[in-house]
Amino acid sequence: MDSYEKEESVASTSGIQDLQTLSELVGPENAGEGELTIAEEPEENPRRPRRYTKREVKCVSYHAYKEIEDKHPQHIKLQDWIPTPEEMIAQKVQNQDLGTILSFDVTCLKSITSLGRNDPGDDPSIMSHVLPVVTPWPMSQDHYAPTLFGILDRYYQGYLKSPATYQTWKFTCQVDPSGKRFMETQFWVPPLGQVNIQFYKNYQILTCCQAVDPFANIFHGTDEEMFDIDSGPDVWCSPSLCFKVIYEGAMGQKQEQKTWLCRLGHGHRMGACDYRKVDLYAMRQGKENPYGDRGDAALQYAYQVKRGCKAGCLASPVLNYKALQFHRTIMADFTNPRIGEGHLAHGYQAAMEAYGPQRGSNEERVWWNVTRNQGKQGGEYYREGGEEPHYPNTPAPHRRTWDERHKVLKLSSFATPSDIQRWTTKALPYGWKVVTESGNDYTSRRKIRTLTEMTQDEIRKRWESGYCDPFIDSGSDSDGPF
C-alpha cells in the first residue's frame, strides 16, 4: 500500500472534548431544522431593484445530528469523531491544484464528470442533487458534509453493535507526492467498501473502493491468481463501483460546492490491488460478520447489487443515468433513506430492475443514440474497448421491446421480505401466494386484473358494473400498482 513521506497524528479524538458536529459546518446550532435561505450579495447599484432568480436560492438541508446523539448517551458522541476545520487548518493544511489531484490516478482514471447545477447542458446527472454512482444510500453532490455524515452514521451504527471492534476516526497530517500537506483518514464501511477521506484547504476528496470486502468478496486462491482480473474475486475494481469525488471549496464553506466525479478502474490507488489475500484475512480478525442471513439488506447489496453492477463497459454518461435510475427507485419509497442518512434501503430488487442490464443491451443502446436526452450530441453508449457495438436487430427507438415490457426481473435468493412482497404483487395474479423455505407466505395484492385472467362471467359482471369496453386487453401480465 502506498505511504506518504510524513505522518503526524492530530485527531486522536479520545483526547479532544470541544469538537463540533458536522451540523455546524453546514448550518446553525439548532441542527435538525430545515429552512430555505436566500444567498444575498451586496448590491452594486442600490437604485436598481433587487431581483431574485432561481439560481440565487440556496436550499440547505439539515439533519438531526444531535437527536441521534441524544438517543445513545452512553456511547461516544458523533461530534467526537471529526476534527473542526479550524483545527485542520491549524496543522498547516495547504491548497492544492485540481490537475495535480487528478494526476495521482491518471493511469486508472476512466472518466471525469463535472457536476453542479451551474454547468451548461441538460444532463440529468449534472442537475441532480444525488451523486450518480451506485451506493447503498444516496450521497450528495452539492456538499461534502451530508455525504460525510452519511458514511459516519453508517460506521457509527456498526460501532453500536460491537464497540470493541470499531475505532474512532483518526485523521493524520500527511504530505502527498507533490509536497502539499493534507489531512487523511481511511476505514472500511460495510457494505459500501473501503473509504478514504482527504482534506486540503480548498478541496475535500472522497475515494471509495467497493471491491474491498473481507467478508463477501475474498478470493481463496493464491496471491498470484488474485491479481489476475480473469480469476479474481466476484467483484473487482470497475468504473461502475469505484469512484473519487472532489468537492471544491473551503472546509467551512456552507454554500453549494463544485463537484468532480472521477470513475476509477482496475489498479487504482487505495483500492483492492493494494490488499493482498493476507491483508483481507487480517481485516477479518477480531470483527464480527456485519452481514446477516438471507433477507438482510446489507447482504443483498454486498452480493446481488455489486455483482449486478460490476461491469464497467458502458460510457460514463450511461453509467450516471443508470445510477440515477437506481437511486430514484429507492427514494420513491419514502421509508427509505435520503441524502445524508446512512441507512440501507428495505430492498434493492426494484432498484436493480431500474438499473437494467449491467453490460447494456441493443434496445437500450438504440434508445440512447436516438433520444440524445443527455445533453451530449454524439455521445457513445459503450466506452472504448467495451462491448461489441454491432446490433443487427434495430427495435423501435421510442419504446422497449415486448420482452422487456412484459417480463419481471427474476427474484434473487438474496431478496428481502419487502422485495418478495413487491415481486409477488407484480408477477402473480391477485390472491396468489409465494411460500419461502422458512414457511413465510406472501400474497399478491394486485388490484388490476387483465382480461386474460377473467372468465366470461367475470367479464359480463364487469360490463354490467359500468366499466369501459371490457375487451380492451393490454396483453401484459405485469399490470399492477407498480
Swiss-Prot record:
InterPro entries: Foamy_BEL. Residues 10-23 have a biased composition (Polar residues). It comes from the Viruses. The keyword Acetylation does not apply. One of its GO terms (biological process) is viral process. GO terms for cellular component: extracellular region; host cell cytoplasm; host cell nucleus. Residues 1-52 are annotated as: Disordered. The keyword RNA-binding does not apply. Bet binds to human APOBEC3F and APOBEC3G. Bet interacts with host APOBEC3C; this interaction does not induce APOBEC3C degradation, but prevents dimerization and incorporation into virion of the latter. Bet counteracts the innate antiretroviral activity of APOBEC3 family defense factors by inhibiting their incorporation into virions. May be implicated in the establishment and/or maintenance of viral persistance. Bet is required for viral replication. This is Protein Bet.
